[in-house]
């Protein structure tokens, strides 16, 4: 648990040290957190490796696929991100689904597919009306799509 605390304190070098130790003890949650640490340090390659290891250890996992999607978005591979989001949705809890669907909006927006991003954002805000960041995103996307035609 110290690795998690270090991660949230943004002390990534200590987090990495603790989490690497935990992975040696077959702690699969540590793989997930290690992926987050690597991604926070812009080490996308190692982050992807951790998320893939996590998925192979626990099976299909919304958290693992969401991590891979975040790596793909960081790398500019939006189609792969959307593929990983699709793979993660069937096993997602409500919180995980919220994260996956928000990242889906981001991926479409980064692809400059504002019409699809707008549709996804409207669906998202209907499902998660309390998400103020998504409401801002929706307002932004409306400006992007109304000026297209």
What are these regions (language model features)?
Residues 8-9, 40-41, 74-75, 110, ...:
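Register position in tetratricopeptide repeats
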Residues 1, 33-36, 67, 103, ...:
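Canonical tetratricopeptide repeat
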Residues 24-27, 59, 93-95, 129:
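Short coil turns that delineate tetratricopeptide repeat
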Residues 21-22, 53-54, 87-88, 123-124:
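Canonical positions in the second alpha-helix
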Residues 4, 29-32, 63, 96-99, ...:
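Start-of-helix register in tetratricopeptide repeats
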